Amino acid sequence: KNKFQIRNIILENNWKKVFKKKINLIILAVPPKLQEKIIKYNFRYKKKIIFEKPISQQYTKSEKIVKLLKEKKIKSEINLTYLNHDLFNKLKLLILRKKLGRVKRYSVVWSFKGIDFNNRIKTWKTDEKQGGGIKNIFLTHVFSYCEFLFGSNRIIKSKIKYSKFKGLKYKKFISSDVNNPDNIYGKISVFNKKTGFQNHKISIWFEKGYIKLFTKSKDWTKDFILKIHSKNKITTIKSKNKFK
């Protein structure tokens, strides 16, 4: 059978048929190669669409797709999860309102457990040319929320460690030093680990204090804690795991 109905959910094995139905919003969670095809197919239907990053396997192709989406006035959004996270938005307000003064510097350390890489499985997720790898899957999240919090950045220098398997040259560790026009210096480290929960920590040093936003969890986005260190006071806020 081509489709199975469970209450109000219809599972369709031909994605093109979905566009012919009375659906207002399409949400994609597919590999970049297929995602590019689906987004282009939607040019004729112009349905609102939410997609993952990277948009396609190549940066130039992704740029062209974004340009066409704007020209065709198709409502679209890339799923940059952290920009909609309750505590990331709380942190942005604290920075904008200068509750602890001006930001002096910050660091990001994100260690994660890559299942495909650790098991030496050759998939698009371990192949940077197919839109996978640390740079495309993880580092893009970090750069996007750093721009959201601190403004546009430029990379000063980077350090990369590689691991080779099944003909792939996999970046298992990336460290980047960044700076922005306001002279806010940042150090970003993203790397694969073999065991344990993923560990994601953002540390920010201000003129009048220090803030740490962190989680140690199986889930990328859940159980974050915001700790605000001001003069003689520490305030702790736990995430409600809510998104805009």
Annotated model-derived regions:
Residues 81, 201-244:
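C-terminal glycine/acidic-rich active-site capping loop/insertion
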Residues 53-54, 79-82, 110:
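Short strand-turn motif at the edge of the Rossmann-like AdoMet-binding core
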Residues 64-82, 102-106:
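Rossmann-fold dehydrogenase core element
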Residues 9-68:
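Beta-loop-alpha module in the N-terminal Rossmann-like domain of NAD(P)-dependent dehydrogenases
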Residues 84-158, 164-167:
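Predominantly a Rossmann-like dinucleotide-binding segment in NAD(P)-dependent oxidoreductases
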Residues 51-52, 76-78, 213:
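Hydrophobic residues in well-ordered beta-strands that form the structural core
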Residues 1-6:
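N-terminal Rossmann-like dinucleotide-binding module
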Residues 137-221:
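Contiguous beta-strand/loop segments that form the cofactor/metal-binding neighborhood of enzyme cores
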